[in-house]
Amino acid sequence: YDAFAPAFGKYVEELKKSDMPACERKYTPANVKTGYTSASQVQYVARCGNFRDGGYEYTGALRVLKVIFSYDYLWINVRVKGGAYGCMSGSYRNGDMYMVSYRDPNLRKTNDIYENAADYLEHFDVSDRDMVKFIIGTIGDMDTPMNPAAKGTRSFGAYICNTDYESLKKERGQVLDCNVERIRELAPLVRCAMDENYFCVVGSSKEINKESELFDKIQPLIKVQG
């Protein structure tokens, strides 16, 4: 850092200081459920939404939920029972939430699993020992060792997103204080996000067309110029 700071400071001083008008995003968001067909025999099934649209706020318990989904609900239902190569989920401070499967032989079945996630959380019940494991896994993700480049990326991201130390401290406290009841309280957030039903699939033409009622639009992933 001692070597970086003076060099970067000089770079900043040389940047143009003229005021630039703020740009406006002039577009209307649209929810177009799209199926992208390809020669693949497996699917990549994604569904997302935003829980802040329903008036809910971000909490550190959502980081614990990601671990729970990764090792329990999504892993067991999408990966173990469903046969997908993998699955993932996540939530952001701006309210965005997603669930994704990859190299998945299923389509509708996986979408149903996403839809039922809130029901799973309403009845979530694990032992104190398992809850501690989920929290430890979450802290492990938060405290992953980083090289200088990774630290710089994290700090720059925090700066751009206006995430201060107090916000991170609050999030960590919410992770450490998480329990079964806190996870159950996330059910409305997940239901809100999944009910927005931003849905996209890349996969087999046969499978996507078989479930065509799930989509507003179906088109080739790669358009061949003829």
Residue ranges and their predicted role:
Residues 1, 5-8, 33, 156, ...:
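Generic intrinsically disordered, low-complexity segments enriched for polar/acidic and small residues
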Residues 9, 19-20, 26, 125, ...:
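Short, flexible coil/linker elements and helix-boundary hinge sites characteristic
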Residues 10, 16-17, 26, 33, ...:
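Context-gated lysine
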Residues 42-64, 70-180, 186, 195-203:
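M16 family metallopeptidases and their MPP-like homologs
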Residues 177-226:
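In a subset of proteins, long, contiguous C-terminal domains/tails are tracked
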